[in-house]
């Protein structure tokens, strides 16, 4: 499982190895957010968790010397750049 959470851990999203959403955990602080903001945070965190799952697959493929993955799976700098946008 791959996880992404906001700073105060009030919104946590878990995705499986294939990138499928497995769970969304909402703490009381998250329930105080306006609907649009909460939805936006869930989507953005889900995207980050998905990117992390895809990066793990990329690393496995690189370790196994699989060719042709360059443009199909995210790199670590790409995932880190997206993670840096999670400013909440």
Model-identified regions with their sequence ranges:
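Acidic, negatively charged sequence signal
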Residues: 1-5, 10-15, 23-88
